[in-house]
Amino acid sequence: MTTQFDNVSVVKKANIYFDGKCVSHTVLFADGTKKTIGIIFPSTLKFNTGAAEIMELNAGKCRIRLAGATEWNTYEGGQQFEVPANSSFDIETVDTLDYVCHFI
């Protein structure tokens, strides 16, 4: 996992979801790809996906339950998890979660 992204454009307007519990900014790359960099404050939320995603966790800890699953899996800073396209996942955070969402 890289510690910085070079030669990118950042959308100034924040993406604010769930009454401010999740805040991110979109990062645009020269090759046309995009990522979001953000934080999720302590909460339990459900996210829907359009594109497949890799959620890279920089700091914090969370529990994830993918659509159709019954079990929760725990992830923390330095780990990542993948979510299929046109799906959803539940996320529970106790501490603030710092993440990068890679759209794949």
Swiss-Prot record:
Coiled coil: none annotated. Keywords: Glycosyltransferase, Transferase. It holds the Pfam family Ppnp. It catalyses: a purine D-ribonucleoside + phosphate = a purine nucleobase + alpha-D-ribose 1-phosphate; adenosine + phosphate = alpha-D-ribose 1-phosphate + adenine; cytidine + phosphate = cytosine + alpha-D-ribose 1-phosphate; guanosine + phosphate = alpha-D-ribose 1-phosphate + guanine. InterPro entries: Ppnp (IPR009664), RmlC-like_jellyroll (IPR014710), RmlC_Cupin_sf (IPR011051). CDD domains: cupin_PpnP-like. Its EC number is 2.4.2.1, 2.4.2.2. Catalyzes the phosphorolysis of diverse nucleosides, yielding D-ribose 1-phosphate and the respective free bases. Can use uridine, adenosine, guanosine, cytidine, thymidine, inosine and xanthosine as substrates. Also catalyzes the reverse reactions. PANTHER family: PYRIMIDINE/PURINE NUCLEOSIDE PHOSPHORYLASE, PYRIMIDINE_PURINE NUCLEOSIDE PHOSPHORYLASE. This is Pyrimidine/purine nucleoside phosphorylase. The gene is ppnP.
